[in-house]
Amino acid sequence: MPKPKWNLNTIYISERLQESLRPISRCAMTTVVAPMGYGKTTAVNWYLGEHAKTETLHIIRISVYSDNLAIFWKSVQEAFARAGFTFLREYPCPTDAAGGGLLVDDLCHMLAGESPCYIFIDDFHLLTDKRASLFLCMLANRLPANVHVIVASRDRFLPAAEAVRLGG
């Protein structure tokens, strides 16, 4: 009997890690925090890939490249456009709470629907501007039930009060 061929491109996600990822579809925001090289991106991509096999969903993948807020905002606009949501191209980067609130209102209105929508922000630790994490908290508190934010970071970034308010 011939030996089975191994596929070195197979990703193995342990049952324990799979269990840790399952609540993502029930939470407004999930943070995945671990040191570099621990597979944060791989695990989230696996999770999203598995869900995409069984249901129609929208996936918006945003990569953080530096602590420059303008570059991050351009990444956000491009990521939403690639996912078919071009409405953000009109928006300037919000600079205060009022602008952030207006953006949250419009995001919630445009993303609400029947299909699940996952917004995956990778390497968030590179974005050191505290306004970004506060904006994510404001967004998570108002998201429609079909939208889920997943944030991968090397460091904890949520203020303690916001973590409690979000249920973490």
Residue ranges and their predicted role:
Residues 138-147:
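Substrate-engagement module of ASCE P-loop NTPases
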Residues 155-168:
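Short regulatory helix/loop adjacent to the ATP-binding pocket of P-loop NTPases
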Residues 118-122, 147-154:
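Structural recognition of the conserved hydrophobic beta-strand(s) that form the central parallel beta-sheet
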Residues 39, 66-67, 124-128, 157:
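Short acidic, S/G/P-rich loop/turn micro-motifs used as interaction or catalytic elements
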Residues 107-132:
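Conserved P-loop NTPase "ATPase switch" module shared by AAA+ and STAND
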Residues 30-61, 78:
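P-loop NTPase Walker A phosphate-binding motif
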Residues 1-22, 90:
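Conserved adenine-nucleotide phosphate-binding loops and their immediately adjacent elements
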Residues 70-90, 104-108:
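Conserved NTP-binding/hydrolysis module of P-loop NTPases
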